[in-house]
Amino acid sequence: MEKVTFYGEIEGISLEQMVRYGKFDMRVKHFHNQYEIFYIIEGERLFFFNNREYVARSGDLILVDTNLIHMTKSVTAEDTGHNRVILYVSYDRMKAFDGQYPSLQLVRFFHEHYGVYHLDKEQQALFLNFYRNLRIAMTEKAHNYKVGIDLETLTWLFKITSYVSKQEGASPHSSDHPKYRTA
């Protein structure tokens, strides 16, 4: 069972929070033409990309490049569920951000730095505050809220690019399943 606790969107940016109860495995690998920023509030997930699996836990941030084949599944058969937030940014919107602020090189950043990142407590609070601010803006739709969403998103992307550039992503998890072993 699953429950979408929030969904909001503007052109090129969408935000979703979902709680899943119990074990959940995606049945097929997939890709999309959006950048995916996946944050785990509670629980844990196995992420698969580039024929490797990574364990992501509460407080972890997962960056998924556009058109990157990926999927997630439960870590164990006894999985009790997870609570996650996903921010999707379209390729066109990311290119527009790059056009406004070329030194950020966001398209290049996602291409080079997709993966699982373990955030410290301050960075976790930063993401949750970012999520809260976007959620409020998308719900209340106050004057110039779309500009506010762009500014919040750019500020957060600026901060995360600095952090990720200094940290290595998580190492692949050793799988017992022969289908997912790395070569």
Question: What feature does the model see in each segment?
Answer:
Residues 84, 127, 146-149, 153, ...:
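Hydrophobic packing residues in well-ordered alpha-helices of helical domains and bundles
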Residues 27-28, 52, 75-77, 173:
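Short, flexible, glycine/charge-rich loop motifs used to bind or transfer phosphoryl groups or to couple energy/partner
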Residues 62-64, 87-88:
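Short hydrophobic-aromatic micro-motifs
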Residues 1-61, 68, 104, 115:
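Generic protein-terminus/edge-of-domain signal
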Residues 36, 83-86, 182:
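Broad gene-expression machinery/nucleic-acid interaction feature
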